[in-house]
Amino acid sequence: MNWKDKVKTTFYSCDRFVRFVIQHFIQDDCTYIASALAFTSLLAVVPLMSVGLAIFSSFPVFQGLAEPVQNFIFDNFVPATGKIVQSYLQQFTSQVSKLSIWGIVFLIFTALLVMFTIERAMNKIWRVSSSRHGVSAFLLYWAIISLAPVLLGLSLAASSYLFSMPILADHRAPYTILHYSPFFLSLIGFTFLYVVVPNCPVKIRHAFWGGLVAAILFESAKHAFAYYLIRYNTYALLYGAFATVPIFFIWVYWVWIITLLGAEISYAFSVHHQRRGGKSLDGFSHALLWLHQLWLAQQHGKGLSFNDLVDASKQPFAVDVDEMINALIYHELIHATADGHYMLSRDLSHVTLYDLTQLLPYRLPTHLELQYSKASLAEQWRAAFKRHNEELKKSLDINLEELFKKTGTVIK
């Protein structure tokens, strides 16, 4: 393959990948989900700050760092209106100490609720039918809420210590690192979100690429939003002093748009069959292949993740993987477990190939399709499909004119 062909192939693959991301972004109603998450985030921002600061202040090593952490967050992650929003939120959080025990419980519940909403959105993108429940969900959400301020505090404490060292005091490198630290923190945060929150295994490299795109878009949006507010602040003219609220809501909305787009990119990298070349594996063989893989896993008492199923074939799939998953679940052939894996729902000793042809909306592969699926199909399957095609050919070996003559009258 010469360089021109390589360029064409790369361009075609990128075009398919981008189309896939856009299609799924629209299909998953990400704009609607982003608006719901933005509203939930506004309700939960005070509880989240209160819980985070309470955890942060409980560590003696972080005494005196609470205000620098807040300043760092609002200076680097909230454009233009950050200082005003910060002053309002500090007034709200200062009232938390006056709450009763039930008020504090409600605050914690609201903080956990936003995590549940985020997980549900991520599960929809990764096509996971079940969310975490009970203790496992609580522990994960609480770990994220409690670890985030601690890790941020550790990073700031480490930075302060390093910059105070005489050997680094006169060098420009530490300040260059500090300048780019918001970008790297965004990258780490997005990657962590895409790996941990979905209720299914997500490879770190796939989450990283989605996180990288999201971090770049986030930094770009931050500067663009700040520029717009400085040059064309329509909301300030309309709402006056009250303009901070709609501006902050719009900014949170766009943050969630970027976050969900990064999640769609991570998911697209996971479903790498969309970028494979070659002839597609037909729908019936695809279903049979996945049932076979699940049957093999069940012999060892295990289920398979979404990525495991996608990796079962080196060929691209003719039927979209989401459609196939939904078809197998709908016909009660497989089900999703609590940890996001898939397992068989039926005893396959009582399911015949004929049953499968009647259940699934996919026909048996033709002779031509069998030639292109040598890498994915066992010889026993190929022999059964070949016999079916030969018998079908004998049964339907009648020309249409003869068939119509036998019909006799015109069908009304």
From Swiss-Prot:
Protein family membership: Belongs to the UPF0761 family.
NCBIfam families in alphabetical order: yihY_not_rbn
TM stretches of this protein: 36-56, 99-119, 137-157, 177-197, 210-230, 241-261
Pfam families: Virul_fac_BrkB (PF03631)
Subcellular location(s) of the protein: Cell inner membrane
Alphabetic keyword roster: Cell inner membrane, Cell membrane, Membrane, Transmembrane, Transmembrane helix
Predominant location category: membrane
Native organism: Legionella pneumophila subsp. pneumophila (strain Philadelphia 1 / ATCC 33152 / DSM 7513)
Membrane topology per record: Multi-pass membrane protein
Stated name of the protein: UPF0761 membrane protein lpg0643
Record-linked InterPro entries: UPF0761_bac, Virul_fac_BrkB
Keyword Cell inner membrane: yes
GO cellular component: plasma membrane
